[in-house]
């Protein structure tokens, strides 16, 4: 989408000229003649970049005073000062007060375009750095399973469409990551990605964070998530926890594309793509009267399901390797190699907390695993709640090694437990189980039937 640029100059010829040059380059331009007009434009919709005349003749505030207000309320917005001949010292002083750069009158169109491109690129890089500092997840789904390949293909198709998406999946499965992938695949990828988790915010606080608050007696203006996400994507996480009154206001935003801050009747227009998620069955919430059906249909133009980890067990080795690399880089913990027996147990676990639970267990394993740091992590070193899946010998000794051996090397007494665990590990896929244990598919079928393993 086109970047939104505000030009503030008391001379209409100058502001019109700047706006014309920028619009020819594909930008969206607005103008204001004085400080009050500029503040009104910024309040209505925060621009990506501001060109500001230093003097602003006839204005309540001059350019430097207005600059101070802009940098205090919107420190991330770059401001380029417009100066006349003889104002260079003042322009330099403006840079010391937070201006990004300055351009002299009469100015060269090429220089104007270059400064614009550079300022917007700086804005983009700062935003990326801020978002990367918050990220502790991969930028894409890790894994090669068919369900993940299908999910990636769906993201590639819906990302560029600008349609509203409803992501459905259990807690910890990667709903926010899927939303980030959709954002990255869209034309808004260089814009902000803002997250509001309805389950993590009290109902009283939710509207404050979502819509913001107008400046008034005893309170400062607060920009809400809708304004923060202008030009980008707003991710509404766990929308089933959103109060009905807030649902009503969100529906109006979707219908009218405008909203009002708390304490104000003034309409604010934003350009935001909304992606939402839930771990509940919204049809049941609608039937119980807890969620608006019309809002559901507005949000779920394209529904996407993120599978639980139990449906993609074959991705667990890739996920474990990824998390070991990530955790060792961010914490300084030594990398460890996970042995085949331990990996088999990890793949056999049901993981009710999904990918998030797996990550936490990998981190716990790196912290608590003793012994030679160069030695493989074995099943006996796994956390108790996961390692409890390892079968034991009748005499009470551990049988951890059995999970990593072909069937022909396992003792006959353990065939039933061994094969049941392996089938669970591979999600009921007989072909992959047969390949791992070293049997023909037909022979495995006969063995399972003889053992009574379903």
Swiss-Prot record:
Keywords assigned: Activator, ATP-binding, DNA-binding, Nitrogen fixation, Nucleotide-binding, Phosphoprotein, Repressor, Transcription, Transcription regulation, Two-component regulatory system
Modified-residue entries (4-aspartylphosphate), positions: 53
Transmembrane regions: none
Domain Response regulatory: 4-120
GO MF annotations in UniProt: ATP binding; ATP hydrolysis activity; sequence-specific DNA binding
Functional description taken from the UniProt entry: Member of the two-component regulatory system NtrY/NtrX involved in the activation of nitrogen assimilatory genes such as GlnA. NtrX is probably phosphorylated by NtrY and interacts with sigma-54.
Name of protein: Nitrogen assimilation regulatory protein NtrX
BP GO terms, sorted: nitrogen fixation; phosphorelay signal transduction system; regulation of DNA-templated transcription
Domain Sigma-54 factor interaction: 141-367
Residues annotated as binding ATP: 169-176, 229-238
Organism field: Azorhizobium caulinodans (strain ATCC 43989 / DSM 5975 / JCM 20966 / LMG 6465 / NBRC 14845 / NCIMB 13405 / ORS 571)
Feature: DNA-binding region: 430-449
Pfam families: HTH_8, Response_reg, Sigma54_activat
């Amino acid at each position: 989408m086109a970047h939104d640029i505000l030009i503030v100059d008391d001379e209409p010829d100058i502001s019109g000229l700047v706006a014309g040059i920028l619009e020819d380059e594909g930008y969206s331009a607005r103008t204001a003649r004085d400080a009050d007009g500029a503040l009104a434009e910024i309040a209505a919709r925060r621009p990506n970049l501001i060109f500001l005349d230093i003097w602003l003749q006839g204005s309540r505030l001059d350019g430097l005073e207005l600059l101070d207000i802009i940098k205090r309320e919107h420190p991330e917005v770059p401001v380029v000062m417009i100066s006349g001949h003889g104002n260079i010292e003042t322009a330099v002083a403006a840079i010391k007060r937070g201006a990004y750069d300055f351009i002299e009158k009469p100015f060269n169109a090429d220089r104007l375009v270059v400064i614009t491109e550079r300022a917007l690129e700086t804005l983009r890089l700062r935003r990326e750095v801020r978002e990367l500092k918050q990220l502790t997840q991969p930028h894409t789904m890790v894994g090669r399973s068919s369900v993940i390949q299908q999910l990636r293909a769906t993201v590639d198709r819906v990302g560029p469409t600008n349609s509203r998406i409803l992501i459905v999946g259990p807690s910890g499965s990667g709903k926010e990551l899927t939303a980030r992938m959709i954002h990255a695949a869209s034309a808004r990828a260089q814009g902000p990605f803002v997250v509001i988790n309805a389950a993590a915010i009290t109902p009283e606080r939710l509207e404050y964070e979502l819509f913001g608050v107008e400046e008034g007696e005893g309170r400062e203006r607060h920009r809400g998530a809708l304004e923060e996400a202008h030009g980008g994507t707003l991710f509404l996480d766990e929308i089933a926890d959103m109060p009905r009154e807030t649902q009503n206001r969100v529906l109006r935003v979707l219908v009218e594309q405008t909203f009002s801050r708390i304490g104000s009747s003034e309409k604010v227009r934003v350009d935001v793509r909304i992606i939402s998620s839930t771990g509940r069955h919204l049809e049941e919430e609608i039937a119980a009267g807890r969620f608006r059906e019309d809002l559901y249909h507005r949000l779920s133009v394209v529904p996407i399901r993120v599978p639980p980890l139990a449906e993609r067990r074959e991705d667990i080795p890739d996920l474990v390797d990824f998390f070991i690399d990530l955790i060792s880089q961010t914490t300084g913990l030594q990398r460890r190699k996970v042995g085949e027996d331990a990996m088999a147990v990890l793949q056999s676990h049901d993981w009710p907390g999904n990918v998030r639970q797996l990550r936490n267990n990998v981190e716990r394993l790196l912290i608590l695993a003793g012994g030679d740091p160069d030695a493989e992590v074995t099943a006996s070193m796994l956390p108790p709640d996961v390692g409890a899946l390892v079968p034991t010998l009748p005499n009470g000794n551990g049988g951890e090694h059995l999970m990593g051996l072909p069937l022909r090397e396992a003792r006959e007494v353990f065939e039933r437990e061994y094969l049941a665990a392996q089938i669970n590990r591979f999600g009921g896929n007989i072909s992959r189980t047969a390949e791992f244990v070293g049997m023909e598919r037909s022979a495995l079928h006969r063995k399972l039937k003889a053992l009574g393993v379903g």
